[in-house]
Amino acid sequence: VLDGNAILFITERYGMRAHASWGSLNDVMLVFMNQDAYDKFRLSKEDYELQKELEKEQKNTTEAKKNDKKKGDNKEKSEEKKEEKVKDIVVELNNIEDRIVRLTPNSSDLGSAIITKDGETLYYLSAFEGGYDLWKMNLRKKDTKLLHKMDAGWANMEMDKDGKNLFLLGSNTMQKMGTDSESLKPISYQAHVKMDLAAERDYMFNHVYKQEQKRFYNLNMHGIDWDAMTKAYRKFLPHIDNNYDFAELLSEYLGELNVSHTGGRFRPQLKGDATATLGLLYDWNHNGKGLLISEVVEKGPFDHARSKVKAGNIIEKIDGQEITPESDYSVLLNGKARKKTLVTLYNPQTKERWEEVVVPVSNGVMSDLLYARWVKQRAADVDKWSNGRLGYVHIESMGDDSFRSVYSDILGKYNNREGIVIDTRFNGGGRLHEDIEILFSGKKYFTQVVRGREACDMPSRRWNKPSIMVQCEANYSNAHGTPWVYSHQKIGKLVGMPVPGTMTSVSWETLQDPTLVFGIPVIGYRLPDGSYLENSQLEPDIKVANSPETVVKGEDTQLKAAVDELLKEIDGKSVSYTHLRAHETDQYL
């Protein structure tokens, strides 16, 4: 930007960072290549205007001298075309770090940023409330204003070469804005394309081949002759005429690499029927009419003060339609998510019948409610088995939301517990191994005391007491790496079942046909001995399986084993410490 005298970039230097390893608020910055450009940028509005007048006068004087000289030249010389000399960019690396300027007045979730050719105006896309909006900042006056409320889920923009128009691409629209009028106008278009789908699939197959060849984390492709393997699978292409089969072909093809985080996926853009749920659990041994309620799920549609629904009640009708043993009640909830629905109920104990209007939820919402129920049950079991001595946290995924929940619980309601059971089972990954390592590897070095009263132990933002981690066969990706780091750093023991070696980082790429996606494992995690965590199974210190027979009874054998082991460790350390203190006392008697 600024004719090559500065570089515009976005950084998280001043922004708030997420608890977890990624995610932050950003700022737009400029770094100036030379002192002259930096000095001009910092001029006040008045000084800048004076500077422009001075430069204008100097330019006029120079041109006048040139014109006087031309009068004496002959006609032939006056008609010669003079090549315009490209102005050199002066780059002064000395003290360049002192010529970095923060442009945005505050950090935010940024989408894109552009500075005008004269360096006077900054346009940027930022999300403060909801989606991305277009903001404008006068860099000389330091004046910022919201230019257009767009509320876009994602957005990007480019300026034309003359600097007269901004082109904005949002979630579902393309728009144009003249920098003089600053009014947004939609860009409408209509196009027809005739696709050779077989040729497109051939192109996409070649693209997958090249991308894996150039970006796969392991240089020898896990020992696979990639060209030969590609040739072997290419012969199936002429026989494929749909994306279902093409995605399956990609999965088989990429599966030859014997690696996680890859394969082809087809995401058909179809809107099918969606069955809602009432947020209830039922007794399937009930043979009569209606649905016998066995549990009202917490925070579900019926879990509110005005509802009389409880376990033991029977749902007789939904929107006036009777439920019989022969009928499928789910049909009555088709398309009812977030819509008011009339439910007729019966209490066998009091013989009372009544109706309630409820708003059913989607299966996705119900899944979240059942997850919260599962975690609450595990926490209650740990509390019961340890007699209130241990706390329990479950890391749902290796991301910021889960980390915040864990952080809040261990340093909040469980702060005074003697130990923590960390459950990673069924975690699909993300990136938290460093954060979990730091959080649970605290070692107390002193205590803050205020007028004789202990305030807190230090470090105060880490767990300084014993812990244990539970894992299972369903752990994946960073949920393999996190227990590995936890064990390798000797923070605590692992309890449960072996975890498949799936610790790589992936780049999921959408193909030219946006219904198709494939994965490239681009980062491997290598150990000092040269081996990788990928394909290296992680064994627990204490191997315990949850059998189907115990799971259906609501019993968690793995969790019970973890509680017993952690209590044994804590009690063992307590006995050892008491013995050590007694021995030290004997020395001074």
Describe these PLM feature segments.
Residues 578-585:
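Conserved small/polar residues in nucleotide/adenosyl-binding loops
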Residues 273-325, 400, 523:
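PDZ/PDZ-like domain segments forming the peptide/carboxylate-binding groove
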Residues 231-278, 336, 345-351, 359-370:
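Interdomain regulatory linker/hinge segments that flank or connect interaction modules
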Residues 32-58, 90-108, 139-153, 182-197:
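Multi-bladed beta-propeller domains
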Residues 1-80, 126-133, 171-175, 194-197:
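A flexible loop/linker signature enriched in serine peptidases of the S9 family
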Residues 215, 316, 321-322, 326-513, ...:
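Cleft-lining beta-strand/loop regions that shape enzyme active-site pockets
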